[in-house]
A protein has these predicted regions:
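Short loop/turn segments that connect beta-strands within the blades of beta-propeller domains
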Residues: 2, 9-10, 33, 49-51, ...
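Structural motif
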Residues: 2-6, 45-55, 90-96, 132-139, ...
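Solenoidal tandem-repeat scaffolds enriched in leucines and small polar residues
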Residues: 5-7, 15-99
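A short beta-strand motif characteristic of beta-propeller blades
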Residues: 13-19, 61-68, 100-107, 144-151, ...
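Repeated scaffold domains used in trafficking and secretory/extracellular systems
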Residues: 22-32, 69-82, 107-120, 152-165, ...
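Residue position within the beta-strands of beta-propeller blades
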Residues: 38-40, 86, 124-127, 169, ...
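Eukaryotic tandem repeat interaction scaffolds
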Residues: 86-157
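Hydrophilic extracytoplasmic domains
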Residues: 139-146, 152, 157-218
């Protein structure tokens, strides 16, 4: 085999194995319902590199659905509100658990600088107009691929994380928590000591520095 994927349960017992003899598996994820697994293999279609997204029911070696993403580079697999999210360098494509297309969002700015899929029924994307610099756009996208809100920014963004009802954005000198509609919910100034942030489901955020971490409670 060129590659293989094995799924284990919480006790460490193997529940599913997928082997690919023709293509290389570049990513795989157990879907949020814990009943299916998605795997992406690298191949080509009509002479163009293409990623094939296959969804398997755990316990079956036959794919329930097969979809092809052409002309873009897959960056990661995740889940938004139960859908399978395929994050590429050009768009966010969402599939339902049975493999049907739920929606797709093509980036308004050409460069993806960050992403987080942990929000309640939405994804947060940080896009850039240029390869470097701070002409940025923060976007929230629903599970059907519809843009919910966008916010332009000229500030340097060090880190972004979405969880539950809020998105935490760490700027060079402040931390701002936004709602999915990108309305400011809370702000903490003077955060030059922090390098990254993790938003938590309970509405708090963890600021991480070079050797310490701090819990921010709005």
């Amino acid at each position: 085999y060129k590659s293989a994927v094995t799924v284990y349960d919480a006790s460490g017992e193997k529940t599913f194995a997928f082997n690919s003899s023709e293509h290389y598996v570049i990513d795989a994820v157990v879907m949020r319902d814990c009943k299916r697994m998605a795997a992406v293999t690298l191949g080509e279609s009509d002479g163009i590199f293409a990623d094939t997204v296959s969804i398997y029911s755990l316990g079956s070696d036959k794919a329930d659905s097969v979809n092809t993403l052409t002309g873009s580079l897959l960056l990661s697999l995740d889940s938004v509100a139960g859908t399978l999210s395929c994050l590429t360098d050009e768009s966010l494509t969402l599939f339902s658990s049975d493999g049907t297309l739920s929606g797709s969002y093509r980036y308004e700015y050409p460069y993806l600088r960050g992403s987080s899929m942990g929000g309640d029924n939405y994804a947060a994307l940080l896009l850039s107009r240029y390869r470097s610099g701070s002409t940025l756009k923060l976007v929230t996208v629903s599970s059907d691929g519809t843009e919910m809100a966008s916010l332009d920014s000229s500030q340097e963004v060090l880190s972004m994380s979405a969880a539950g009802k809020y998105i935490a954005v760490l700027y060079s000198d402040s931390l701002v928590l936004y709602t999915p509609q990108l309305q400011e919910y809370a702000r903490l100034d003077g955060t030059e000591y922090a390098r990254s942030v993790i938003m938590r489901e309970d509405g708090t955020a963890v600021l991480i520095g070079s050797s310490s971490a701090w819990l921010y409670i709005p």
